[in-house]
Amino acid sequence: QTGNVLEPSCGIGNFMGLVPESINDAKFYGVELDSISGRIAQQLYQKNSIAVQGFENTNLPDSFFDAAIGNVPFGQFKVPDKRYDKHNFLIHDYFFARTLDKVRPGGVIAFITSKGTLDKENPNVRKYIAQRADLLGAIRLPNDTFKAAAGTEVTSDIIFLQKRDRLVDIEPDWVHLATDANGIRMNAYFVDNPEMVLGDMQMVSGPHGMESACIAYENAELGDLLRDAI
């Protein structure tokens, strides 16, 4: 109900605007690289602390935030930051890594990210996260979830993490991929917990050939499916 909440890529503040009244007393900190979106957020949510700059340039203290939320930016490029350069993270992976350092031990992260975070063949970023946080759960969303808002069809996941109080050399099942009953490669968590996939996993034609996608169920309300999953 109170505490410090970070949104490291807040856009115009849509998430902040939809916060339940029960946590209205929390202090929200937003970061937004785009100057127009950031200034809009500053005007809309004047009681929040919103920095219009790159996440990598912020001076936010480590282990300060009780929670972090947001839709992390996605792309095939890296963010220059000496603290993390050795890990060779792409931008979405970088946002997970830096946010983990900003959240206190026991704090929770709830991020929306492309399915690439959990499904890519290279497990390095998942191992990095697992050493620093416990996976509380994940929900796979249909690829048309954000079509109306963003005009894109991308299979996305909501990932819930709780930061550990120390680094642990651990490699849980969700670090790795597995194959479902239909022969589709995906994160082992979703193979073990198919009820957390809110659609039908299929192989579809993508920009680089065939790829897996979560296709929405016909005549199903995503809101109802999401409530059941949570």
Annotated model-derived regions:
Residues 82-87:
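Short glycine-enriched, charge-decorated loop/helix-capping segments at active-site entrances
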Residues 148-230:
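Flexible, glycine-/basic-rich loop-and-beta segments that form/coincide
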Residues 1-77, 89, 101, 106, ...:
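Conserved S-adenosyl-L-methionine
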Residues 73-75, 116-118, 145, 165-167:
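Conserved nucleotide-binding/hydrolysis micro-motifs of P-loop NTPases
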Residues 35, 88-147, 154-160:
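Conserved Class I SAM-dependent methyltransferase catalytic core
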Residues 57-60, 144-148, 206:
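A short acidic, often aromatic-flanked loop/helix-cap motif at beta-alpha or helix-coil junctions
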Residues 77-81, 121:
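Conserved ATPase-coupling elements of RecA-like P-loop NTPase cores
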